[in-house]
Amino acid sequence: LNYEDNTFRYRQDSTFLYYFGLSCAGLSAIIDIDEDKEIIFGDELSIDAIVWMGSQPTLHEKCERVGVKNLMPSAEITSYLHKCVQKGKAVHYLPPYRPEHKLKLMDWLGIPPTHQEGSVPFIRAVIAQRNYKSAEEIVEIEKACDVTADMHITAMKVLRPGMYEYEVVAEMNRVAESNNCQLSFATIA
């Protein structure tokens, strides 16, 4: 996390993935109801990224796969939003978590970070939609619960007098990783 390309190992919020079906860092999106279009703002991979990760589908191809026809470079979101504001359009957004996102919102909409509370009607609409779970989502939730239970049971089984906490945590992490799961936060030991 000491380098821009070392992204976090987890998503703090899956709203972007939920609505746009893409799990890629550095993307922004707008659902423009007035224009009846969805736009993803992002940039194609740099040559450095391609050398590091190998050949990848282009961002354009990824957008096509999820049914988004409009892709614009990241730099164009500012002018797009400024035009919306100039036309008097309401711009709804969810409350930002990360400080860099608060700075982006300030640049895009002119709203200081201390006043970025998000749109309550939009927040309520997202909550209402996210309350309904598909069969696939329920399977993943149940898997997460099962793995978490296995982690705790493993900790209880391996725990011995004189063990260090890091040894117990290592066993818990082994259970998670052997199930192809990553922790959303460090184990509290």
Residue map of PLM features:
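Active-site cores enriched in adjacent His and Asp/Glu residues with nearby glycine-rich loops
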Residues: L1-N2, E142-A189
